[in-house]
Swiss-Prot record:
Gene3D superfamilies: Periplasmic binding protein-like II. Transmembrane segments: none annotated. This is Lysine/arginine/ornithine-binding periplasmic protein. L-ornithine binds at D33, S91, S92, S94, R99, T143, D183. It holds the Pfam family SBP_bac_3. It comes from the Bacteria. One of its GO terms (molecular function) is amino acid binding.
């Protein structure tokens, strides 16, 4: 009798675990901007690599679905999600009130502070007095673009938007920009620590404004995909709890990227 009860309990447990993901599609198409190392980029072989990619693959594994990564310009990600060309966004997408009017988000993936970079020795600071008359590059469709347009542009700062982050760095290095505003970690790991960024440094402290930058980044999802949102949250919670998240993060960062 005890053996029968144990066997039944195990069967019920397995059935429950399987049914929790039963409503999910077999394949989940995840959109990402591959110009944002170390979160999302492509290696020499054209494979998707980065912390966002590792997180997405691990969550899909736990959800028992196949991940298909779709490269996209950043500002096309939310329109593609709403048009059902992709099923989710994992691309350093900050959770903001404005975006939550359009789409749903998972729980926080990691923190996301923003910061200016400029040539080493430059006196530029993230203030109106310092930036007036200067050319500042931002990623099109990003929270940094929204912030710069609404707080700096009308005060005489030339805010220049680019389709991808690599173009921002390229024009900064070529001297066509005086500074660039982007995610702090992406700037540090994807530019300042690379050969192309050797003559540049952070300019001033982090730019903080919850209205524009939110409380961190998350998986972007359609509002009517409640099952998929719940599945991502469940998988994320598991990998945070069992230490997998910290192990993956250490591959890229020497600090607490999750934040408070």
């Amino acid at each position: 009798m005890k053996k029968s009860i144990l066997a039944l309990s195990l069967l019920v447990g397995l059935s429950t675990a399987a049914s929790s993901y039963a409503a999910l599609p077999e394949t989940v198409r995840i959109g990402t901007d591959t110009t944002y190392a170390p979160f999302s980029s492509k290696d020499a072989k054209g494979d998707f690599v980065g912390f966002d990619i590792d997180l997405g693959n691990e969550m899909c594994k736990r959800m028992q679905v196949k991940c298909t990564w779709v490269a996209s310009d950043f500002d096309a990600l939310i329109p593609s999600l709403k048009a059902k060309k992709i099923d989710a966004i994992i691309s350093s997408l900050s959770i903001t009130d404005k975006r939550q009017q359009e789409i749903a988000f998972s729980d926080k993936l990691y923190a996301a502070d923003s910061r200016l970079i400029a040539a080493k020795g430059s006196p530029i600071q993230p203030t109106l007095d310092s930036l007036k008359g200067k050319h500042v590059g931002v990623l099109q469709g990003s929270t940094q673009e929204a912030y710069a347009n609404e707080t700096w542009r009308s005060k005489g700062v030339d805010v220049v938007a680019y389709a991808n982050q690599d173009l921002v760095y390229s024009d900064l290095a070529a001297g066509r920009l005086d500074a660039a505003l982007q995610d702090e970690v992406a700037a540090s790991e994807g530019f300042l620590k690379q050969p192309a960024g050797k003559d540049f440094a952070f300019a001033g402290s982090s730019v903080k404004d919850k209205k524009y930058f939110g409380d961190g980044t998350g998986v972007g999802l359609r509002k009517d995909d409640a099952e998929l949102t719940a599945a991502f949250n469940k998988a994320l919670g598991e990998l945070r709890q069992d230490g997998t998240y910290d192990k993956m993060a250490k591959k890229y960062f020497d600090f607490n990227v999750y934040g408070d």
